[in-house]
Amino acid sequence: MKIAIASFTRNGCAWNQKLCAALKKHSCEGYALEKYGKEAGIPAIAPSLPAWTERMFQKMDAILFIGACGIAVRSIAPYVKSKKTDPAVLCMDEQGKFVISLLSGHIGGANELTEEVAAVTGAVPVITTATAVSYTHLTLPTKA
């Protein structure tokens, strides 16, 4: 998967770098607000968050926002089209406590990526897709 990771705080930048290094089976690109990214050596989210999000929506398989869900939702809203074509979108708080599969969970791979990010960070994975949480996509054994 081609993954873009966006961070908005100093602590978010630390997670950004850790995740880019740890998710080795993927191709990760880290980005940050200029004032924090500059000191961490992470490219800036530029020229603006909306323009960056539009570009990432077109070229990446997944986007992970390290920050408030509100930032993620407002950033992706203009570009959401279809669960069949939209990239996976995740959101993780800057303390690394929770990672949320926000968009394209099942088809786009956000649920699986959420589990991978949680394994790296120790975060609680938050997955709300009905088939994932109720196991309705599995054939469960029945008692004889």
Identify the meaning behind each predicted range:
Residues 30-54:
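N-terminal beta-loop-helix "entrance" segment that forms/cooperates
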Residues 88-134:
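Long, charge-dense
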Residues 136-142:
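Conserved small/polar residues in nucleotide/adenosyl-binding loops
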Residues 1-35:
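N-terminal basic/disordered segments at the start of proteins
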Residues 74-85:
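Short Gly/Thr/Asp-enriched flexible loops that form oxyanion-binding sites at enzyme active sites
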Residues 1-2, 26, 58-62, 84-88, ...:
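Short coil/turn connectors at secondary-structure junctions
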Residues 5-6, 61-63, 97-107, 138:
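Flexible, glycine/proline-enriched loop segments at strand-loop-helix junctions
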Residues 29-33, 64-67, 91-92, 125-129:
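General beta-strand structural signal in soluble alpha/beta enzymes
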